[in-house]
Amino acid sequence: GMRKGMIVDLTKTTNAIAKSIEKAQRSSGYEITSALVSIAGSHVSSINSRGAVGITNGVVSQVDINRALEAAQVVAIPHDREVLHVIQRGFTIDGQDGINEPIGMHGYRLEVETHIITASAASVENIRKCVEATGVKVKAFVLNPLASAEVVLTEAERQLGVMVCDIGGGTTDLAVYINNNVWYTTVIPIGGDLITSDIAYGLRLSLPDAEKVKVAYGRAKESDTSAHEIFSIRPFGEEEATEIRY
């Protein structure tokens, strides 16, 4: 029901989500009534923006931070886009940058540097419609590589600098962390399904058979392969198996 992160069949997508929810409920023993939903696709984009405001009463408060974040969002975001995240990357007070926690600090001018992630409003609503058709309430949407990072990254890795690369079926999702902040995100509309398709075309196999070959014999690094490794396949129209050396 989805292709490269975009819904192409509402019914199939809803049914797939329902099966996933049922499986999760069965394995966890809990009823799922609401969820944070990860999102990806070629419709997702991001920009960097800055916002600046005067500091009320000369001491930074949460109100000042909120005002600065709102100012950062005064950018040319089209009406057909929905803001998923406004991620603060650092603050500057009166020209002093590199500040992470400005609350309580004295100054006159507060600036914030942000990373703003948006998605197609129509795509977001289509995903919401499919999820809520299963009886599960969508609490919020989160960009897929950010959700993945919460699971696989340590704080030390985020601090030193790291990139998350999540290769899915239809997309490859990237997020770069520097100094514990998100500095770059992107969604590339190419994933594992394209590799399967190339194998099917090159070896003249069905997609299910090509997927089996990819999983069984695929290697992430060329150094992991052996020049003497051989496997057998039966291409379309062939009665006898063919040996493949790689």
Question: Residue spans of the language-model regions?
Answer:
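Glycine-rich phosphate-binding loop of actin/hexokinase-like ATP-binding domains
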Residues: 160-202
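Nucleotide/phosphate-binding catalytic cleft detector across ATP-hydrolyzing
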Residues: 1-164, 181-183, 203-246
